[in-house]
From Swiss-Prot:
Name of the protein this chain belongs to: Cytochrome b
Membrane topology listed for this record: Multi-pass membrane protein
Gene from which this protein is expressed: MT-CYB
Cystine pairings recorded for this chain: none
Cell location: Mitochondrion inner membrane
Length: 379
């Protein structure tokens, strides 16, 4: 009798994706983050589902309902903080995953990479709309500022913004539709993630050396299942440490003040994982220019495959490109810091220089260093 694992129509799919999947024998812990994001997504959907059972998407009761969840619902506080900090863990894994893709040349799997960029945009949209739901000061003003950016679009901008708001300002209609979208998007993300895996399994995984590993594959289970479980335990330990010891560390104190359209907070800023993009947005003194730079800061990932000049896929044996990569990481950390600072000297000029450097590294220096390294190999 043949194994049911290999013959059953449904179990066969799982088997070919997680058990008998031929995997390179040398992939490092940097390849853990995909599965960690899968776990984050499941965790977010589950905690979000339980929060939605008690949350009300009405401007008069939204803030109170979140307070009610934390005070009166059994274990509501832990569900709420796991959901809020789970988003942060999700983005940490996301940034590591994208960084890994850039370092090891995974972007040459074009379909997988482009679906990944689409996933990144969708996750960012979901997180933004989720941040609006508690209806605190930063929720309200964050929603106002970010949706207002669309008014920079020539001719249709103002109409578009009012259409998204469902009125002439961020109000009840906006909150209700954001809740609806925030609920549906994670399921769209799940579908995109399945497509992401589908295209990845067409080619097989990349590996740190960047050369074909077809001659040296091992089954995913038990080798990488156990390795993924280790990564999972580390991530859950970090998440629960954050949730149980300092749940508000990454939040904004202003969000504990109910939304008030008549009182603007002194510093409007998004959650930490958007600060790098926010800094790029603010570094351009023109509204439309800033919005374009904001979109390009992520869309620039889409042209990285076209800018790959090196004869080698991975950066493992390319010291010049490695230096540029880590400079890019440092630059992103600088942008994240600047995004949380007030708009005054010297932060303005630091933000502008960091923004220029960000685009310069990806669009100019990386391709040049790849070409230089090709020449160096001839010596």
């Amino acid at each position: 009798m043949t194994n049911i694992r290999k013959t059953h129509p449904l179990i066969k799919i799982i088997n070919e994706s997680f058990i008998d999947l031929p995997t390179p024998s040398n992939i490092s812990a940097w390849w853990n983050f995909g599965s960690l994001m899968g776990v984050c997504l499941v965790l977010q959907i589950l905690t979000g589902l339980f929060l939605a059972m008690h949350y009300t998407s009405d401007t008069t009761t939204a803030f109170s309902s979140v307070t009610h969840i934390c005070r009166d619902v059994n274990y509501g506080w832990i569900i709420r903080y796991m959901h809020a900090n789970g988003a942060s863990m999700f983005f940490i894994c996301l940034f590591m995953h994208v960084g890994r893709g850039m370092y090891y040349g995974s972007y040459l799997f074009m379909e997988t990479w482009n679906i990944g960029i689409l996933l990144l945009f969708t996750v960012m949209a979901t997180a933004f709309m989720g941040y609006v739901l508690p209806w605190g000061q930063m929720s309200f003003w964050g929603a106002t500022v970010i949706t207002n950016l669309l008014s920079a679009i020539p001719y249709i901008g103002t109409n578009l913004v009012e259409w998204i708001w469902g009125g002439f300002s961020v109000d009840k209609a906006t909150l209700t539709r954001f809740f609806a979208f925030h609920f549906i998007l994670p399921f769209i993300i799940s579908a995109l993630a399945v497509m992401h895996l589908l295209f990845l399994h067409e080619t097989g995984s990349n590996n740190p050396s960047g050369i074909s590993s077809n001659s040296d594959k091992i089954p995913f289970h038990p080798y990488y299942t156990i390795k993924d479980i280790l990564g999972l335990l580390i991530m859950l330990a970090m998440l629960m440490t954050l949730v149980l010891f300092s749940p508000d560390l990454l939040g904004d104190p202003d969000n504990y003040t109910p939304a008030n359209p008549l009182n603007t907070p002194p510093h409007i800023k998004p959650e930490w994982y958007f600060l790098f993009a926010y800094a790029i947005l603010r570094s351009i003194p023109n509204k439309l220019g800033g919005v374009l730079a904001l979109i390009l800061s992520i869309m620039v990932l889409a042209i990285t495959p076209l800018l790959h000049t090196s004869n080698q896929r991975s950066m493992t044996f390319r010291p010049l490109s490695q230096c540029l990569f880590w400079l890019l990481v440092a630059d992103l950390l600088t942008l994240t810091w600047i995004g949380g600072q007030p708009v005054e000297h010297p932060f303005i000029i630091i933000g502008q220089l960091a923004s220029i450097l960000y685009f310069s590294i990806i669009l100019i220096f990386m391709p040049i260093s790849g070409a230089i390294e090709n020449q160096l190999l001839k010596w």
